[in-house]
């Protein structure tokens, strides 16, 4: 919730508040954590009904229904490491990666355990002091 005060010279004679979403980065972390803990489910049909009546977690001997806060999926995600024309995935072969990064752009994760080739580049740049031009 965010609030803003209204009044003469900064006095808070009237206060207006409204509900806001969390910061985008925080929301991204929440969704990523949910994705890591997502549970596979399967639809269960009632004996007389043709439509699925509820979802249950897909594990042997498990009859627990997912909680309202669970992120659920019915089919597993495709393997994004390999090229798959059916899903439109180009795979990760030949992609540039960051050897020192620990997240998704890091070579260990992006190259899917296939290894990677390293190249070292050297560039010479002319230094330019910004925003000052002496007479």
Curated annotation (Swiss-Prot):
<feature type="disulfide bond">
    <location>
        <begin position="97"/>
        <end position="107"/>
    </location>
</feature>
<keyword id="KW-0449">Lipoprotein</keyword>
<dbReference type="GO" id="GO:0030182">
    <property type="term" value="P:neuron differentiation"/>
</dbReference>
<dbReference type="GO" id="GO:0060070">
    <property type="term" value="P:canonical Wnt signaling pathway"/>
</dbReference>
<feature type="disulfide bond">
    <location>
        <begin position="130"/>
        <end position="131"/>
    </location>
</feature>
<comment type="function">
    <text>Ligand for members of the frizzled family of seven transmembrane receptors that functions in the canonical Wnt/beta-catenin signaling pathway. Plays an important role in embryonic development, including dorsal versus ventral patterning during limb development, skeleton development and urogenital tract development. Required for central nervous system (CNS) angiogenesis and blood-brain barrier regulation.</text>
</comment>
<keyword id="KW-0964">Secreted</keyword>
<protein>
    <recommendedName>
        <fullName>Protein Wnt-7a</fullName>
    </recommendedName>
</protein>
<keyword id="KW-0325">Glycoprotein</keyword>
<dbReference type="GO" id="GO:0005615">
    <property type="term" value="C:extracellular space"/>
</dbReference>
<feature type="glycosylation site" description="N-linked (GlcNAc...) asparagine">
    <location>
        <position position="98"/>
    </location>
</feature>
<comment type="similarity">
    <text>Belongs to the Wnt family.</text>
</comment>
<dbReference type="InterPro" id="IPR013300">
    <property type="entry name" value="Wnt7"/>
</dbReference>
<keyword id="KW-0272">Extracellular matrix</keyword>
<dbReference type="InterPro" id="IPR005817">
    <property type="entry name" value="Wnt"/>
</dbReference>
<keyword id="KW-1015">Disulfide bond</keyword>
<feature type="disulfide bond">
    <location>
        <begin position="111"/>
        <end position="134"/>
    </location>
</feature>
<dbReference type="GO" id="GO:0048513">
    <property type="term" value="P:animal organ development"/>
</dbReference>
<dbReference type="Pfam" id="PF00110">
    <property type="entry name" value="wnt"/>
</dbReference>
<keyword id="KW-0217">Developmental protein</keyword>
<feature type="disulfide bond">
    <location>
        <begin position="5"/>
        <end position="12"/>
    </location>
</feature>
<dbReference type="GO" id="GO:0005109">
    <property type="term" value="F:frizzled binding"/>
</dbReference>
<feature type="disulfide bond">
    <location>
        <begin position="3"/>
        <end position="17"/>
    </location>
</feature>
<feature type="disulfide bond">
    <location>
        <begin position="81"/>
        <end position="112"/>
    </location>
</feature>
<dbReference type="InterPro" id="IPR018161">
    <property type="entry name" value="Wnt_CS"/>
</dbReference>
<dbReference type="GO" id="GO:0005125">
    <property type="term" value="F:cytokine activity"/>
</dbReference>
<dbReference type="GO" id="GO:0009888">
    <property type="term" value="P:tissue development"/>
</dbReference>
<feature type="lipid moiety-binding region" description="O-palmitoleoyl serine; by PORCN">
    <location>
        <position position="9"/>
    </location>
</feature>
<feature type="region of interest" description="Disordered linker">
    <location>
        <begin position="41"/>
        <end position="69"/>
    </location>
</feature>
<dbReference type="GO" id="GO:0046330">
    <property type="term" value="P:positive regulation of JNK cascade"/>
</dbReference>
<keyword id="KW-0879">Wnt signaling pathway</keyword>
<dbReference type="GO" id="GO:0045165">
    <property type="term" value="P:cell fate commitment"/>
</dbReference>
């Amino acid at each position: 919730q965010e609030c803003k005060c209204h009044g003469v010279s900064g006095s808070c004679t009237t206060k207006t508040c409204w509900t806001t979403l969390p910061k985008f980065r925080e929301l991204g972390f929440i969704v990523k954590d949910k994705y890591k803990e997502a549970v596979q489910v399967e639809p269960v049909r009632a004996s007389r009904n043709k439509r699925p009546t509820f979802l249950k977690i897909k594990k042997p001997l498990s009859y627990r229904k997912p909680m309202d806060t669970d992120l659920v999926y019915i089919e597993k995600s495709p393997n994004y490491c390999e090229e798959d024309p059916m899903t439109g995935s180009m795979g990760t072969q030949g992609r540039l990666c960051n050897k020192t990064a620990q997240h998704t752009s890091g070579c260990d994760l992006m190259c899917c355990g296939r290894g990677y080739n390293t190249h070292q580049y050297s560039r010479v740049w002319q230094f330019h002091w910004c925003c000052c031009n002496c007479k």
